[in-house]
Amino acid sequence: MSERLVTSNEIGIDSTNEYSLRPEKINEYIGQDKVKERLNIFIKAAQRREEALDHVILYGPPGLGKTTLANIIANEMGGNLKITSGPAIERAGDLAAILTTLNTNDVLFIDEIHRLNRSVEEILYPAMEDYVLDIIIGKGAASKSIRLDLPKFTLIGATTRIGMLSSPLRDRLGVLCSMEYYTDEQLKEIIIRSAEILGCHITEEGAFEIAKRSRGTPRIANRLLKRVRDFAEVLYDNEITEEAAKKSLEILEVDGEGFDRIDNKILEAIIDNFNGGPVGIETLAYFVGEELDTIEDVYEPYLLQKGFIVRTPRGRMATDKAYKHLGRVRFNESKIDSKQCTLFEK
């Protein structure tokens, strides 16, 4: 199966020109205004005290710029960024090897920090609190503990599931930042900036057309820009206008809401096969031809967020927005009361 253009997870195309598109300083970073304001204050305060920035947790959906913010923090603090992930650190020794390579004001960025092994976490606690690393050399009766001093560094954890962090780890993270989806206007600014870096001419209308299909996510916006740029170079004299963006994205099967073929197939299944629902998730997955976990983790969250489906105790139901989007008429007069539905009922 080909890679999905509108997934917020990282795919192969994202590595192309990825770092050239990322801002280096906090005043270049577009969006997340509340997060930027707080971080800017904390960074300046740490600099004035000549201390390391307190440890940070960035949480929210994927693709919103957590790694970019970590890189900006490292640049602002005059340190280097070292990147790893929770699943990649399998043993305490793996983490110890990383910690001993850090220098003063370096930033250690751990993606998916909620997936850290608990034994690995225990190594982190004294490193975060006291900047020391306790290691045991030898085995059995001959073993001994050695304490190594570490430079003043900043740990930045990123997670899509803040509730899965252990309490001891969460208590040691002094700066909590919630990342939110971007507005279409903010994404338009990001797209215009990225187009300039890529050497592609784009109109404001063309940028907005891509922005509104980018699902509130900069990673998707930049990905769609790269693909639309290909069409512009071949078919539209290297200029992305509103019309060029529309036609290109139609060929890429990304509609005006940012839905792709499977998103629309889910809505069609609920409306056409089950009269708008309710329908159980297992049955829905069967009709769509996707794995149940894929429906729940990949496709459903955005449809819920946009208000095109709701979860009820009896299953998924399509809303009036879904009917309108597909050009269908609701023959069932019953209305969905969203207040009686919950995003967390299965």
Curated annotation (Swiss-Prot):
Q: Which Pfam families match?
A: AAA_lid_4, RuvB_C, RuvB_N
Could you give a single Gene Ontology term from the biological process aspect?
DNA recombination
This entry carries the following GO cellular component terms, namely:
cytoplasm; Holliday junction resolvase complex
Chain positions covered by the region annotation Small ATPAse domain (RuvB-S): 183-253
Where is this chain primarily localised?
A: cytoplasm
Which InterPro entries would you find in this protein's record? AAA+_ATPase, AAA_lid_4, DNA_helicase_Holl-junc_RuvB, P-loop_NTPase, RuvB-like_N, RuvB_C, WH-like_DNA-bd_sf, WH_DNA-bd_sf
Renumbered to this chain, region (Large ATPase domain (RuvB-L)) spans 1-182
Intracellular or extracellular location(s):
Cytoplasm
Gene Ontology molecular function, alphabetical: ATP binding; ATP hydrolysis activity; four-way junction DNA binding; four-way junction helicase activity
Q: What keywords were assigned to this record?
A: ATP-binding, Cytoplasm, DNA damage, DNA recombination, DNA repair, DNA-binding, Hydrolase, Nucleotide-binding
Q: What is its EC number?
A: 3.6.4.-
Task: Identify the residues that bind Mg(2+).
Answer: 67
The kind of enzyme this is, by top-level EC class, is hydrolase
**Matching Gene3D superfamilies, A to Z?**
1.10.8.60, P-loop containing nucleotide triphosphate hydrolases, Winged helix-like DNA-binding domain superfamily/Winged helix DNA-binding domain
Amino acids binding DNA: 311, 316
Q: Where is this region: Head domain (RuvB-H)?
A: 256-346
Q: How does it associate, per the subunit comment?
A: Homohexamer. Forms an RuvA(8)-RuvB(12)-Holliday junction (HJ) complex. HJ DNA is sandwiched between 2 RuvA tetramers; dsDNA enters through RuvA and exits via RuvB. An RuvB hexamer assembles on each DNA strand where it exits the tetramer. Each RuvB hexamer is contacted by two RuvA subunits (via domain III) on 2 adjacent RuvB subunits; this complex drives branch migration. In the full resolvosome a probable DNA-RuvA(4)-RuvB(12)-RuvC(2) complex forms which resolves the HJ.
UniProt xrefs under PANTHER family: HOLLIDAY JUNCTION BRANCH MIGRATION COMPLEX SUBUNIT RUVB, PTHR42848
What does the record say about domains?
Answer: Has 3 domains, the large (RuvB-L) and small ATPase (RuvB-S) domains and the C-terminal head (RuvB-H) domain. The head domain binds DNA, while the ATPase domains jointly bind ATP, ADP or are empty depending on the state of the subunit in the translocation cycle. During a single DNA translocation step the structure of each domain remains the same, but their relative positions change.
Q: Please report which protein family the annotation says this sequence is part of.
A: Belongs to the RuvB family.
Q: What is this protein called?
A: Holliday junction branch migration complex subunit RuvB
Give the organism the record lists: Clostridium perfringens (strain 13 / Type A)
The gene from which this protein is expressed is ruvB
